[in-house]
Amino acid sequence: MGRNKKKRDGDDRRQRLILSFDEEKRREYLTGFHKRKVERKKAAIEEIKQRLKEEQKKLREERHQEYLKMLAEREEALEEADELDRLVTAKTESVQYDHPNHTVTVTTISDLDLSGARLLGLPTPEQGAGSGPEEEVSSMEKPTRALPRKSRDPLLSQRISSLTASLHAHSRKKVKKKRLRRAQDTTKKPPSATRTSKTRRRRLTGKARHSGE
């Protein structure tokens, strides 16, 4: 007796799924590993360059602000020196005496002594006489303050140096690989001309034996 096959209704049938692959995209995916790797390296190098430019821009702005600050301090010091020059001025007083035969003019010159009132912070004459040479030596030894040449932020310079080092490392990888390949090619030993196969040696030994007999 044969098996009774149950007839399925049209609603119960499952729809077939047909998968179609794009051969070009499939081939590109399977063979494009090196291409994608090179693209990732290029993107990383571009990102490092962009970050390096930003850090250098920050460093330039910081140095510019330091220069402006130093300029303002120097201008303020010059203004203070001008004010002191105006204060240290000489006052002259003239008195004329008329006589029948000649005229006498008495002029009194008095300087404004700021050291007496301790306005300038200068030492007294007794102290100045004893410590004259020492003050000259100390004034000669004092270094002049120069404009800042380097950034005061060490972290910023460290970031720039690390970014440049990574950029050079990425660019030198290809050169190192090429050099290694060239070195391997040069170190390969050429096959020796005197090397013979086993069959060749057997033939030679056989000929030697026959010639000896």
UniProtKB/Swiss-Prot annotation:
Keywords: Coiled coil, Cytoplasm, Nucleus, RNA-binding, rRNA-binding. GO terms for cellular component: cytoplasm; nucleolus. One of its GO terms (molecular function) is rRNA binding. It is found in: Nucleus, Nucleolus; Nucleus; Cytoplasm. Residues 32-95 form a coiled coil. InterPro entries: Nucleolar_protein_12. This is Nucleolar protein 12. It comes from Bos taurus. The lineage of its organism: Eukaryota, Metazoa, Chordata, Craniata, Vertebrata. The gene is NOL12.
